[in-house]
């Protein structure tokens, strides 16, 4: 049975949650952290994923890829590329499809991976984390992504999940997942005809900022308006601090960290920590040892200075709030509560700016780091056939308007807007077109100016075939079921021809009609389904052949990672055995080995140790196993003697304890019998006495 799994795919850290035991739990990783760094690194033999990748980032900086969600679907020539590239330490390259990939050195060779592949590697890692925690099969996942993600980016994430061996039951907007988390845990929401509770959610994470206005009633939520600033997040604060110190240290220490990626990354990491310290303190020291050229750097920063550094960012706080309220057709006064989520909302000056934008105090009833993952896990559980969850209905809204167009055959019109921006999804629309034969359709963004420059206008296209004209007709009506699915992806679910036929329907008899009254009929025209048509879709999703190729590649790398981990484990086991056995041979095992055995085994241990630190330092799993078994063949004999003697001692102790217990029981029994006998004698003496008075 699969455990429903929710993934908050963060730019800096990701959070995992599962639905189980009538609740939703956060999954901790291998080092017991409640979030996992969204990092993929590459080494001489294997990949470094999550915590390992983060730990090795400074020493493996050119072969470590972070900020994964920012290059998903990113065109190499997109205006955003220049802004994104400054956050990457690995080399970004243009792929054959004009998208952005990363070039790294892996297993001694140069490799280029697409953003989808990199995301798949990380998702595969967190899938294993959930599997280790739950001890269950993991197949279904709901992944939370930013609302500003385009159709292409959502397909890329879904494909990444499939490459990782998962079924993406839903790609959900992250702030909507937080809203679901709010709705399922709140017990005081209005019901029935009561006025809905209006809640604004402000989510500022590592790289982007979203404001969403939602209406809540018990068991349901409806998104009313959403707006984003995709270049406003915690990393921008970190970068501002880093650039400040880069200038200061250039003057103060005559070093330029901008020329040294490792040094720059160390200052950036320290800047992130400083930012967090300043959230609780008005001043904080800053220092990094041997940052470059053996130079130690130190300084300090005040909260006031930080606010001045990020002043251009703070001036943009109100814009998403204003836009979200406008789309929701509400004023700030009509908002009942303002919930803040995302790690960056802990910054005091940001809190103040958000509060001022709404003119009311902020609420923190949700866990700022975990609400999205928990909501995603609940949504995944809704799709599970094996779990029963409380009913909860939610509707999101289209961030961009989408129109459908078709070959012009009969109609004057050849396109129409089907899903306007701000309309709810999932949703289905039926349209009818008169067709003269097979035709094609396409879905496109209605107003490309709503999207970032260079975004592909067309979302998908379809070929509809199998149209048969009835004899004597020059066209046939075709009904199409257009769908925006729960993940926000646009499809044509069904296409079929229809025809009008005449049928006879009985005319209802009057209530006072006699029982033998003759039934009369009338002819009516009904529209009925005639022939199903074939739909061939061309979307941003990977075709089956390419998907299978990438699945195979991922499985090969996964097998290599596993082999390297097992080899390292065997190596460590051998090393530990050498030291442990050598120590025991001189102590507790000494009486149980002959001088010849000791000499032989000591020689074997010395030889194995020399091999381990020489040619065996980088050997294969089988050789480590063979060396271990060679030592154990003699070591286990001596150990067996020791254990046998220990067992004899234990048995002797047990026998002594048993004998002592038996003696004690016998003594106790004898005492009881003596007491009983004395009691009987005393009774007998009492009965023999005669009162002479």
Curated annotation (Swiss-Prot):
* Record's keyword annotation contains Ubl conjugation: yes
The primary location reported for this protein is cytoplasm
Position(s) of the covalent cross-link Glycyl lysine isopeptide (Lys-Gly) (interchain with G-Cter in ubiquitin)? Answer: 195
Q: Which residues are recorded as modified (Phosphoserine)?
A: 660
Q: Which residues carry this modification: Phosphothreonine?
A: 242
Q: Which residues carry this modification: N-acetylserine?
A: 2
Q: Which SUPFAM superfamilies match?
A: Actin-like ATPase domain, Heat shock protein 70kD (HSP70), C-terminal subdomain, Heat shock protein 70kD (HSP70), peptide-binding domain
Q: Say which domain of life the source belongs to.
A: Eukaryota
The record's Gene3D superfamilies line, in alphabetical order, gives: 1.20.1270.10, 3.30.30.30, 3.30.420.40, Actin, Chain A, domain 4, Substrate Binding Domain Of DNAk, Chain A, domain 1
What does the entry say induces or represses the expression of this protein? Increases a few-fold upon upshift to 37 degrees Celsius.
Task: List compositional bias (Basic and acidic residues) regions by residue number.
Answer: 673-687
Q: Which UniProt keywords apply?
A: Acetylation, ATP-binding, Calmodulin-binding, Chaperone, Cytoplasm, Isopeptide bond, Nucleotide-binding, Phosphoprotein, Stress response, Ubl conjugation
Q: Which family does it belong to?
A: Belongs to the heat shock protein 70 family.
Physiological role: Has a calcium-dependent calmodulin-binding activity. Required for normal growth at various temperatures.
Q: What else is known?
A: Present with 71700 molecules/cell in log phase SD medium.
Spell out the PANTHER family in the cross-references: HSC70CB, ISOFORM G, HSC70CB, ISOFORM G-RELATED
Q: What is this protein called?
A: Heat shock protein homolog SSE1
Q: What is the lineage of its organism?
A: Eukaryota, Fungi, Dikarya, Ascomycota, Saccharomycotina
